Amino acid sequence: MGDEEKRNRAITARRQHLKSVMLQIAATELEKEESRRESEKENYLSEHCPPLHIPGSMSEVQELCKQLHAKIDVAEEEKYDMEVKVQKSSKELEDMNQKLFDLRGKFKRPPLRRVRMSADAMLKALLGSKHKVCMDLRANLKQVKKEDTEKERDLRDVGDWRKNIEEKSGMEGRKKMFESES
Protein backbone atom coordinates (compact mmCIF):
# COMPACT_ATOMS: atom_id res chain seq x y z
CA MET A 1 0.00 0.00 0.00
CA GLY A 2 2.79 2.45 0.82
CA ASP A 3 4.42 2.00 -2.60
CA GLU A 4 1.06 2.37 -4.33
CA GLU A 5 0.31 5.64 -2.50
CA LYS A 6 3.73 7.09 -3.44
CA ARG A 7 3.13 6.20 -7.08
CA ASN A 8 -0.36 7.82 -7.02
CA ARG A 9 1.08 10.97 -5.45
CA ALA A 10 3.80 11.11 -8.11
CA ILE A 11 1.22 10.73 -10.86
CA THR A 12 -0.98 13.50 -9.42
CA ALA A 13 2.06 15.77 -8.95
CA ARG A 14 3.06 15.14 -12.57
CA ARG A 15 -0.48 15.94 -13.72
CA GLN A 16 -0.50 19.17 -11.71
CA HIS A 17 2.86 20.18 -13.20
CA LEU A 18 1.66 19.43 -16.76
CA LYS A 19 -1.53 21.42 -16.19
CA SER A 20 0.40 24.44 -14.91
CA VAL A 21 2.80 24.28 -17.89
CA MET A 22 -0.14 24.06 -20.29
CA LEU A 23 -1.83 27.04 -18.62
CA GLN A 24 1.38 29.09 -18.90
CA ILE A 25 1.69 28.26 -22.60
CA ALA A 26 -1.97 29.15 -23.19
CA ALA A 27 -1.53 32.48 -21.36
CA THR A 28 1.47 33.43 -23.52
CA GLU A 29 -0.45 32.44 -26.66
CA LEU A 30 -3.38 34.64 -25.60
CA GLU A 31 -1.04 37.57 -25.00
CA LYS A 32 0.53 37.09 -28.45
CA GLU A 33 -2.92 36.90 -30.05
CA GLU A 34 -4.03 40.09 -28.29
CA SER A 35 -0.93 41.99 -29.38
CA ARG A 36 -1.36 40.72 -32.96
CA ARG A 37 -4.97 41.93 -33.00
CA GLU A 38 -3.93 45.35 -31.71
CA SER A 39 -1.26 45.68 -34.42
CA GLU A 40 -3.76 44.59 -37.12
CA LYS A 41 -6.24 47.17 -35.86
CA GLU A 42 -3.64 49.94 -35.95
CA ASN A 43 -2.55 48.93 -39.47
CA TYR A 44 -6.13 48.91 -40.72
CA LEU A 45 -6.88 52.32 -39.22
CA SER A 46 -3.68 53.82 -40.65
CA GLU A 47 -4.51 52.47 -44.14
CA HIS A 48 -8.20 53.38 -44.27
CA CYS A 49 -8.40 56.52 -42.15
CA PRO A 50 -6.37 59.51 -43.28
CA PRO A 51 -4.52 61.34 -40.56
CA LEU A 52 -6.39 64.30 -39.14
CA HIS A 53 -4.83 67.67 -39.90
CA ILE A 54 -6.42 70.34 -37.77
CA PRO A 55 -5.80 73.77 -39.27
CA GLY A 56 -5.14 76.69 -37.01
CA SER A 57 -7.92 79.14 -37.89
CA MET A 58 -11.66 78.86 -37.20
CA SER A 59 -12.68 79.24 -40.85
CA GLU A 60 -10.46 76.30 -41.84
CA VAL A 61 -12.05 74.13 -39.10
CA GLN A 62 -15.52 75.07 -40.37
CA GLU A 63 -14.49 74.23 -43.93
CA LEU A 64 -13.21 70.84 -42.73
CA CYS A 65 -16.54 70.20 -40.94
CA LYS A 66 -18.46 71.05 -44.12
CA GLN A 67 -16.33 68.61 -46.11
CA LEU A 68 -16.89 65.87 -43.53
CA HIS A 69 -20.65 66.53 -43.50
CA ALA A 70 -20.70 66.33 -47.31
CA LYS A 71 -18.93 62.94 -47.13
CA ILE A 72 -21.44 61.77 -44.50
CA ASP A 73 -24.35 62.87 -46.72
CA VAL A 74 -22.92 60.96 -49.69
CA ALA A 75 -22.44 57.84 -47.53
CA GLU A 76 -26.01 58.10 -46.18
CA GLU A 77 -27.42 58.47 -49.71
CA GLU A 78 -25.52 55.38 -50.84
CA LYS A 79 -26.78 53.48 -47.79
CA TYR A 80 -30.38 54.51 -48.50
CA ASP A 81 -30.05 53.56 -52.19
CA MET A 82 -28.66 50.16 -51.26
CA GLU A 83 -31.46 49.55 -48.75
CA VAL A 84 -34.04 50.40 -51.41
CA LYS A 85 -32.34 48.03 -53.86
CA VAL A 86 -32.32 45.26 -51.26
CA GLN A 87 -36.01 45.79 -50.47
CA LYS A 88 -36.87 45.83 -54.16
CA SER A 89 -34.92 42.65 -54.87
CA SER A 90 -36.44 40.86 -51.86
CA LYS A 91 -39.93 41.86 -53.06
CA GLU A 92 -39.11 40.54 -56.54
CA LEU A 93 -37.87 37.29 -55.00
CA GLU A 94 -41.09 36.86 -53.04
CA ASP A 95 -43.16 37.55 -56.18
CA MET A 96 -41.13 35.07 -58.20
CA ASN A 97 -41.45 32.44 -55.48
CA GLN A 98 -45.21 32.98 -55.44
CA LYS A 99 -45.35 32.64 -59.24
CA LEU A 100 -43.27 29.48 -59.00
CA PHE A 101 -45.67 28.01 -56.45
CA ASP A 102 -48.61 29.03 -58.65
CA LEU A 103 -47.06 27.31 -61.68
CA ARG A 104 -46.31 24.15 -59.76
CA GLY A 105 -49.68 24.13 -58.09
CA LYS A 106 -48.21 24.09 -54.63
CA PHE A 107 -49.95 26.71 -52.57
CA LYS A 108 -49.29 27.44 -48.97
CA ARG A 109 -52.37 26.03 -47.37
CA PRO A 110 -53.64 27.52 -44.15
CA PRO A 111 -53.98 25.18 -41.20
CA LEU A 112 -57.35 23.49 -41.46
CA ARG A 113 -59.64 22.80 -38.57
CA ARG A 114 -61.91 19.79 -38.32
CA VAL A 115 -65.53 20.41 -39.32
CA ARG A 116 -68.30 17.90 -38.72
CA MET A 117 -70.24 17.32 -41.92
CA SER A 118 -72.92 14.90 -42.85
CA ALA A 119 -72.57 12.84 -46.00
CA ASP A 120 -75.23 14.94 -47.74
CA ALA A 121 -73.46 18.19 -46.88
CA MET A 122 -70.15 16.75 -48.08
CA LEU A 123 -71.63 15.65 -51.42
CA LYS A 124 -73.32 19.02 -51.82
CA ALA A 125 -70.01 20.79 -51.19
CA LEU A 126 -68.18 18.54 -53.66
CA LEU A 127 -70.78 18.44 -56.44
CA GLY A 128 -72.16 21.92 -56.03
CA SER A 129 -75.67 23.17 -55.45
CA LYS A 130 -76.98 22.07 -58.89
CA HIS A 131 -76.80 18.36 -58.12
CA LYS A 132 -79.23 17.17 -55.51
CA VAL A 133 -78.06 13.89 -54.06
CA CYS A 134 -79.53 12.47 -50.92
CA MET A 135 -77.44 9.86 -49.27
CA ASP A 136 -79.21 8.21 -46.40
CA LEU A 137 -76.74 5.63 -45.17
CA ARG A 138 -79.21 4.09 -42.73
CA ALA A 139 -81.87 3.37 -45.38
CA ASN A 140 -80.24 0.15 -46.56
CA LEU A 141 -79.64 -1.28 -43.11
CA LYS A 142 -81.70 -4.19 -41.84
CA GLN A 143 -84.18 -3.60 -39.08
CA VAL A 144 -83.47 -5.90 -36.16
CA LYS A 145 -85.89 -6.18 -33.29
CA LYS A 146 -84.51 -7.01 -29.93
CA GLU A 147 -85.99 -10.17 -28.46
CA ASP A 148 -86.52 -10.24 -24.76
CA THR A 149 -84.84 -13.14 -23.05
CA GLU A 150 -86.02 -14.62 -19.81
CA LYS A 151 -83.11 -13.14 -17.85
CA GLU A 152 -83.89 -9.65 -19.06
CA ARG A 153 -87.55 -10.08 -18.15
CA ASP A 154 -86.61 -11.29 -14.66
CA LEU A 155 -84.32 -8.32 -14.19
CA ARG A 156 -87.06 -5.95 -15.27
CA ASP A 157 -89.55 -7.61 -12.95
CA VAL A 158 -87.22 -7.39 -9.97
CA GLY A 159 -86.85 -3.67 -10.57
CA ASP A 160 -84.65 -1.42 -8.59
CA TRP A 161 -83.01 -3.18 -5.64
CA ARG A 162 -83.16 0.00 -3.59
CA LYS A 163 -86.95 -0.07 -3.62
CA ASN A 164 -86.95 -3.63 -2.31
CA ILE A 165 -84.65 -2.71 0.55
CA GLU A 166 -86.71 0.36 1.43
CA GLU A 167 -89.87 -1.73 1.51
CA LYS A 168 -88.29 -4.31 3.82
CA SER A 169 -86.75 -1.77 6.16
CA GLY A 170 -88.64 -0.47 9.17
CA MET A 171 -91.38 -2.13 11.20
CA GLU A 172 -93.88 -2.41 8.37
CA GLY A 173 -91.40 -4.29 6.20
CA ARG A 174 -90.61 -6.75 8.94
CA LYS A 175 -94.29 -7.21 9.68
CA LYS A 176 -94.91 -8.05 6.01
CA MET A 177 -92.05 -10.56 6.11
CA PHE A 178 -93.60 -12.40 9.06
CA GLU A 179 -97.06 -12.30 7.55
CA SER A 180 -95.83 -13.69 4.25
CA GLU A 181 -93.95 -16.55 5.98
CA SER A 182 -96.94 -17.75 7.96
UniProtKB/Swiss-Prot annotation:
Assigned keywords, A-Z: Acetylation, Actin-binding, Muscle protein, Phosphoprotein
Biased amino acid composition, Basic and acidic residues: 29-45
InterPro entries, alphabetized: Troponin (IPR001978), Troponin_I (IPR050875), Troponin_sf (IPR038077)
GO biological process, one term: positive regulation of DNA-templated transcription
GO MF: actin binding; troponin T binding
Region (Involved in binding TNC and actin): 97-117
Keyword Phosphoprotein: yes
The keyword Acetylation belongs to this UniProt entry's keyword annotation: yes
Region (Involved in binding TNC), start-end ranges: 2-48
Family matches, as Gene3D superfamilies: 1.20.5.350, 6.10.250.180
Residue numbers bearing the N-acetylglycine modification: G2
Cellular-component GO terms for this entry: nucleus; troponin complex
Family: Belongs to the troponin I family.
Subunit structure: Binds to actin and tropomyosin.
PANTHER family assigned to the protein according to its UniProt record, in alphabetical order: TROPONIN I (PTHR13738), TROPONIN I, FAST SKELETAL MUSCLE (PTHR13738:SF15)
Protein name per UniProt: Troponin I, fast skeletal muscle
Organism: Mus musculus
Lineage: Eukaryota, Metazoa, Chordata, Craniata, Vertebrata
